[in-house]
Amino acid sequence: MKEIISRHKAGEQIGICSVCSAHPLVIESALRFDLNSGNKVLIEATSNQVNQFGGYTGMKPADFRDFVYGIAQEVGFPRERLILGGDHLGPNCWQNEPAAAAMEKSVELIKAYVVAGFSKIHLDASMSCADDPTPLDPMVVARRAAVLCKAAEETANEEQKCHLTYVIGTEVPVPGGEASTIGSVHVTREVDAARTLETHQIAFRESGLEEALSRVIAIVVQPGVEFDHTQIIHYQPQAAQALSAWIKETPMVYEAHSTDYQTRQAYRALVRDHYAILKVGPALTFALREAIFALAQMENELISPEQRSRVLEVIDEVMLNEPGYWKKYYRPTWSQAMVDIHFSLSDRIRYYWPHPRIRQSVEKLIANLNNVTLPLGLISQFMPVQFERLSEGVLTPTPHNLIIDKIQDVLRAYRFGCTPDVA
């Protein structure tokens, strides 16, 4: 990470896409995409996804590391080009507990991530706990971040410290996109970014963390990008002009969250304007969902009814029977909710792919299509971009390859933004 930031600060149009997903096909897509490029790949886990108690994936930080390393080994991707990051590390999961208890767990969370070899750590103590006022005083946020930083510094060995980097900042959109309809989005004021840096510098120095300050590589801000279930707010460089100018005077860059679904030109403009770390998550699993839905349509054309996976019906049954991951986010009427379940840009389906029934139906879908030849006309009908790549000879038409390539469509847009020599 330090090398990428140094090159950016030296004037290169270089950034990095942060892949925020625990889906094995998404991780495989990212690693295969850069297998021969020489580029680093940044894969991040969030605190509610992966923590010392297992998170909603059931994985502790060391488990997630081994999970990613296992996929890297299968792909042949060298570990030294992998960067593991932890996102929203702090009291996020324990906001309903008193601050003292939540911070105690947060310290253990940080230690678990650092011990497991995660080198990019987002110190996020912005959320109010059960006995806190709302919102928290910025100095309280910074002092709590310093407590977390101290835990990381004391846990890391000398080799880990060479690679250890921190991201600070609190102004992040709702993880995974907005839950409600958006019309506009508030761009962080440069005075607020400056205050974030200043309060963290004071708090770190109070705690004797002067050396750790040199490891702070980025501040999280809102450059004016967002999405909800049906809309995307695209980057408007002029609205973030003052914010973009301010960071030039520091040794840091910005990290932008919820950059999913922006145009490739927007990614290039974001990196040019020093939002050099671009986080993406739902757009990747949305592409995965599109690929599986497309393959299901092909299956309906090629496989006899009694042999079909029924994957789309199984998804509906599971999500309607177990609505916990989508009910409070999607629209209330039946017809609207079904559209959201299938096609919402916030892609709440992503929480259901590990479900045993859905996983088995996807496996059957792929097995069924592996046993037949996929007609080019059918691929053109349901996956036209992949059809073009087949015609160019850069893709072979297996179900697995089609899924991987569909996910990589998203990564191609990020590469255009993050790599100076990509046309």
Swiss-Prot record:
GO terms for biological process: D-tagatose 6-phosphate catabolic process; galactitol metabolic process; phosphoenolpyruvate-dependent sugar phosphotransferase system. Keywords: Galactitol metabolism. Gene3D superfamilies: Aldolase class I, putative tagatose 6-phosphate kinase domain like. It holds the Pfam family GatZ_KbaZ-like. GO terms for cellular component: plasma membrane. Pathway: Carbohydrate metabolism; D-tagatose 6-phosphate degradation; D-glyceraldehyde 3-phosphate and glycerone phosphate from D-tagatose 6-phosphate: step 2/2. The keyword Manganese does not apply. SUPFAM superfamilies: Aldolase. Transmembrane segments: none annotated. This is D-tagatose-1,6-bisphosphate aldolase subunit GatZ.
